From Swiss-Prot:
Organism: Chlamydophila psittaci (strain ATCC VR-125 / 6BC) (Chlamydia psittaci)
Record-given protein name: Sulfur-rich protein
Residues passing through the membrane, by range: 63-83, 92-112
Location(s) in or outside the cell: Membrane
Keywords for the protein's UniProt record, in alphabetical order: Membrane, Transmembrane, Transmembrane helix
Cellular-component GO terms for this entry: outer membrane
Amino acid sequence: MSGENANSIGSDVTSLIQPGLEQVMQDEGVQVSLINSVLGWCRVHIINPIKTSKIVQSRAFQITMVVLGIILLIAGLALTFVLQGQLGKNAFLFLIPAVIGLVKLLATSVCMEKPCTPEKWRLCKRLLATTEDILDDGQINQSNTIFTMNSSESTSASAS
């Protein structure tokens, strides 16, 4: 009986919180704070133990990882846009190195103790939106469902 009571209380609390939660999650400041919290947890529990190894502490390793991330990102995006006409819907396969490069750059940023900024988050959202747009039907046609850009973001993206 007490289990049913706890479930009803939990659903009542959820129904009270949920309408405001969606609006709060649209705020870029909240998104960046949430990302920094998750990155902080990852830094303490995953990154710091890895960083104590001698090879990761070397500057050569860090520079190599940054260069590798940039090369993967640029090569993946370039191949996607250059070969999309010839490959059609299969051109999205070239986004795999770009996504790996993006993840590598973000991980390197975390390893170098730099927090996520609103600019980095906007760049990441734009790249994820473009990736989703290509992955869903092989074309860039703003058919995103998950990573959508607000009208203010799309106007600032077209202005720059």
